Amino acid sequence: VWSNGEPVTANDFVFAWQRLVDPEAGASYAYLAETIKNANEIMAGEMDPAELGVTAVSDTEIKIELTQPTPYFESLLAFSAFFPQNEAFVTEKGDKYGTSSENILANGPFTIENWDGTGLTWDLVKNEDYYAADEVQLEEVNVQVIKETSTVVNLFQQGSVDNAQVTGELVKQLATDPNVVVQKKARTAYIEFNHDNVYLQNAKLRAAIGLVINRDELVDSVIGDGSTAIGG
């Protein structure tokens, strides 16, 4: 159920995905949908978004047509780019959609409140219409964007904030602090090569550049947040 009381339907996903690949929307993650039928042609402006290979079979079921086997496709669906959007709400808000808490419609465990679009604070308020609202233990989360890591650490130590993410040199300084919790997650970072460069068109040269990167030194001395290098 949307936070305005309307039901979430399969059409909300179809609309959202068509909007994702619509070149007029300029979505930065549109490429993630490239294995869906006609997605590349739509992103190139050669076909209408309505021709995307996604259709609503019923109010609760969608049919997705892929152009090739995509083993990771199901994991993509958990990414925010594939979240549903309420067509009537998006159309009503127009260019203002997503620019403030009043212009955002939610269907998750929280709604966003008190955000003006540029401010560095907002509130996440429990969504009573969420299907599993009884399992949501927090009534409200107050979010602050604090750009200086040392500042947020000081606020945490003073008890003014409940959570602080630390990076770089502070990780080493706080390594023995009993309040520090290390959460290791699989994450991939990459370097993009400009294939317009005649030399970088050579796959062996690109592979060679990758081989000379000292990953251990990179994570220890540059990132410095406790990350562990992997091969590849």
Model segments located where?
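Solvent-exposed, polar/charged alpha-helical surfaces in well-ordered, non-transmembrane soluble domains
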Residues: 11-19, 71, 75, 139, ...
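Ligand-site clamp/hinge motif
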Residues: 99, 104, 126-174, 204, ...
